[in-house]
Amino acid sequence: MLLRFMLAIAALIVLAVATTDRAEAREPAYLAPPGSPARVFPPPQRPVADIVSPTRSTEQKRDAAGEFDAVARILRLKPGMTVGDIGAGSGYYAVRLSPLVGPSGLVIAQDVKRSYLAQLAARLDRSKLANVKLALGDAHDPRLPPRSLDAAILAHVYHEVAQPYGFLYNLAPALKSGAQLAIIDLDKPIGHHGTPPALLRCELAAVGYREVSFHVLPADSGYLAVFEAPDVATLPSPSTIEDCRT
C-alpha cells in the first residue's frame, strides 16, 4: 500500500515538472538583445494600420483558397528548416509550418503582442506541437537570434509595422545567407489593411533587400513578394535610409 502511494506521488511530481517545463518553454520571451533603436531610422511618411485582430479571416476560408499550400510550394519549404512566422497572431502559419518542417525543424512564432502569444501557446499545447518556439518582438525590431532563419514569413501584417525601416534592418541579421523573406499582403492602401506592391518594393529596397519573385495568390489571398536580405556587412547606415514618400 505504501509502495503504491509513493509511486502515485512520484508520478504526480513527474507530471508537475513536465507541465512546468512546457509552460516555461512556451513563455514568450525576447530571443536576442535589442538591435538598432527606432529613433535612428526615418519615420515612415505614410499611415500605419492598427493591429485590430490576431486573425485576418477564418482559417477554413484561407485553406479553401489554398493560401498556405501556395506559399509553402513557392518558398520550397521542407523538413529540417527553421522558419519564422513574424506577426504570428493566432498562429495560422505556425500550426501548419510545424508538421511541414517536422521534428528536425523549428518554427519561431514571433509577435509584438504578448496576449496573442499567450493564446497561441495554449493552442500549441492543445495540438501537441512541440517544435514551435514563441518570440516576443518590438515594433521596430523582431529580436531574433543571428543567422537563425532559413525563411521568414510576414502574412498580412506588414501594413501594421509601425517602423518598417528599423524592422527590416534589425531582421536582416536573423536571416541566414540566401534565406527568403516572404511578405503576403493585399494590393490595397495601408488604411484598408494592405500594402501597394510599389510601396513595399521601395521600402525594402531602401534597406538593401532584393526582390526575388512576385506572385498573385489564389482567390482573395493577395500577393506574395519574396525578397533576399542584404548581407549584414552591406546594410546601409540608418542615417542614410531615405523614406519612401507616398
Predicted regions and their residues:
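A short glycine-rich, Lys/Arg-flanked "PGG" loop and its adjoining helix->strand segment in the class I
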Residues: 98-99, 165-180
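A short acidic, Gly/Pro-enriched loop at the edge of an enzyme's catalytic core
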Residues: 140-152
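Conserved class I S-adenosyl-L-methionine
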Residues: 180-203
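Class I SAM-dependent methyltransferase SAM/SAH-binding core
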Residues: 84, 88-142
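Short glycine-centered segments of the SAM/dcSAM-binding site in methyltransferase folds
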Residues: 82, 106, 178-181
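Class I SAM-dependent transferase core
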Residues: 26-84
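A short SAM/SAH-binding and catalytic strip from SAM-dependent methyltransferases
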Residues: 150-164
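Core SAM-dependent methyltransferase catalytic element
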Residues: 216-246
